[in-house]
């Protein structure tokens, strides 16, 4: 899809993240496992019932990287844009996933998400003991316009 003239939205920001990840796969082979779980969007009733029966869960974040880094088991990113807000189910899922040892963050834009991914992939293994095995931004945070706030 040609994004040259696309209006910015949560979707286009996420597409930008995925495009960057595709471009950087040789440098970061782990990015081959980054994926989007298409939980969101409007569905007709029959499709919604079918998806629920298949295991769709409300609140699952947009991006998941199931690769342990530092002290974390994996990375979850919920993408937002503009005035987008977290739904109750999203907040609940992110906090629960963080409680199970995942690094979870909400990013308002591709640049913030890419920065988080780069920082996450640069984490050292747990046993180094040098403090470089934790993310600088607190777990379960919201990043917006360079500012960090707790979920």
Q: How would you name each of these model-derived features?
A:
Residues 1-151:
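Catalytic phosphate/metal-binding cores of nucleic-acid and nucleotide-processing enzymes, i.e., regions
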């Amino acid at each position: 899809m040609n994004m040259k003239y696309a209006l910015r939205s949560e979707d286009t920001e996420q597409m930008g993240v995925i495009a960057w990840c595709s471009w950087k796969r040789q440098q970061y082979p782990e990015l081959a496992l980054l994926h989007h779980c298409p939980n969101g969007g409007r569905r007709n009733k029959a499709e919604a019932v079918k998806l629920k029966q298949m295991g769709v869960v409300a609140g699952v974040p947009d991006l998941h990287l199931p690769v342990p880094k530092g002290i974390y088991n994996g990375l979850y990113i919920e993408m937002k844009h503009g005035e987008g807000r977290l739904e109750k189910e999203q907040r609940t899922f992110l906090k629960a996933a963080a409680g199970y040892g995942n690094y979870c963050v909400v990013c308002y834009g591709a640049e913030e998400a890419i920065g988080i991914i780069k920082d996450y992939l640069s984490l050292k293994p747990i046993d180094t003991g040098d403090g470089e095995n934790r993310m600088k931004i607190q777990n379960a945070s919201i990043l917006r316009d360079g500012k960090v706030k707790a979920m």
